[in-house]
Amino acid sequence: MKKFIKYLIRLYNDIQAKLTSHPISHLPLSKVDIQPIIMIPGSSATENRFNKMVRKLNNGQHPHHSLIRIKVWNDGHMTYRGHLKRKDRSPIFVVGFQNNRDGYKNIKKQAAMFNAAITVLREKYSFNSFKALGHSNGGLIYTVFLQQYLSNHSRLKMEKLLTIGSPYNLNKKEISDRVPMLDDFVTNQEKLPQQLQHLSILGIFFRDGDGIVHRSSVEAGRLIYKGKIASYREAIIAGKDAHHSSLPQNDQAIDLIREFLF
């Protein structure tokens, strides 16, 4: 009977964590030092974007990784949903934005909002190292963060960055037709942390891309990262499950994420 009651309490807490948002100041404490995995979704997506992917990542893993979903609102305040296991050394934080629109101007705003979020997380958990994942424009937000904000954080190190279908040259199909954002990324590549390891996942769903992002736009990441960081490599996923929106929960992608980040 006691076990059943405890189960009901856990179930209730899980449901409440999923349904109820809390002020960021109410984030629970951790009993251990953490090295979080922090994820950023792409444009139009919310902090719930990676729910299915995280369920797949946790499948067969013991213990499961905590999932905390943070939303940064346009007025600067932040809320969160989810539950932190207090002895989880590698919890997953997803940071989404009220302003989740596309375009370089918005990407720069989102990078500033992410910088505010990671400042709050470090004040709460005092970590000096983290691993990162960005889907689509999430990878672009991370690139802006690395070049413009990371050095402002004392002793903070991004150990690994995994990007999925990130369009470093936006919607262009020819690498010779470079957008201003890509030019800025290349100009500022010396600001990238030299110890960083980067894995870029590219989807081939139809001809030369994942149905949304052209192959050459993802491969433009070479111009930014290759030779400037500790390691840069690319992985190609092809087939009917390699569409841009399907890539984060693609089984091959899940294997690559586990291998690289966990």
In which residue ranges do the predicted regions lie?
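Compositionally biased, charge-rich terminal segments
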Residues: 1-3
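Lipid deacylating catalytic domains
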Residues: 7-133, 140-262
